[in-house]
Every structure is written in C-alpha cells, then in structure tokens.
Amino acid sequence: MVLTLVIAPLLFVALAGVLQLGALRVAVARVRAAADLATLVAVNDQDDAELAKSGSLRLSADAADVAREYFARELELSSSLLDGGAETIAAAADVAAYLSAPAYDTRTGARYERPTVRIAALVPVRTPVFGALVLRPVTTVEVLSVSSPR
C-alpha cells in the first residue's frame, strides 16, 4: 500500500510528461507544415510577364509578403497551440525572397541555385503540463523552411 502511494504520483508525472511531449511534437509538425506551405505558395506565385516572355521561372516581386501572409494564415489554424498571435509571430519571422540566382543566404550560409523563398521563425508553443511540472510553460520552436521552383 505504501509503495502504491509513493509510485502512483511518479507514474502520473511521467505519464503527463510523455503526453505533453507528444502534444509538443504535433504542434511542431503543424508549425513546420505552416512554414512549408507558406514558402510553397510564395514560390508558386510567379512573375507571369517574365514567364510569358522568356519561359523562365521568376518569383513575383511580392514573394516575401505572400509568404508572410500565408504563414500567418496557416498559423491561425493552430492558434490554440501558440503562445502569441499568429500575425505577431508571422510579422517577427525572418522572411527572405531571393529573386535571382545564384544567391547566398546570410542567415544560413546556403547557396541557392534557383530563385528561393526562405522563412526562419521562432514560434512560441504552449506546454502547460511542463509548466505544472516546474518546467517552462512555453517552448520556443525554431522553424526553417526553404522552397524554390523546379
């Protein structure tokens, strides 16, 4: 009986921690999918005049704005998981559009051989069980998404 009273709380804490880790993995997957979709939409927003004239793929001049807008839209779908507004998180994200290639990304050091859109963001995700377990109630997730036309 004494052993049960001692071990039961430990098992409960372990179970709660495991469940919070699983929820965190789901939240991270949703945030990464939001960034991936935003860069994909921005890359697919091609300069139609250049495409008709030369047949080459060139990003639209507002590709960075499109990526930021769609990132905010997609984060809004996961707003219950976030510790902050989707618009605020998207506004703070580092969104870069490299309209011509080759280009060098000063943040990552990568060299892009095609026109590219990149989103790098720090997204705060709620982890209330960790907060109850004397850990952080908010976990910041770093997201990096890069897309280019093929």
Name these PLM-found stretches.
Residues V41-T116:
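Short amphipathic secondary-structure patches
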Residues A49, A110-R114, R118-A120, V125-R150:
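Low-complexity, S/T/G/P-rich flexible repeat/linker segments used as non-globular hinges
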Residues V2-A14, V18-L21, L82-D94, R118-G131:
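Hydrophobic transmembrane alpha-helix bundles
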Residues F12, A27, V31, A96-T106, ...:
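Structured catalytic/translocation cores of nucleotide/phosphate-coupled proteins
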Residues M1-E69:
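Alpha-helical assembly-interface signal, strongest on the long, hydrophobic N-terminal helix that forms
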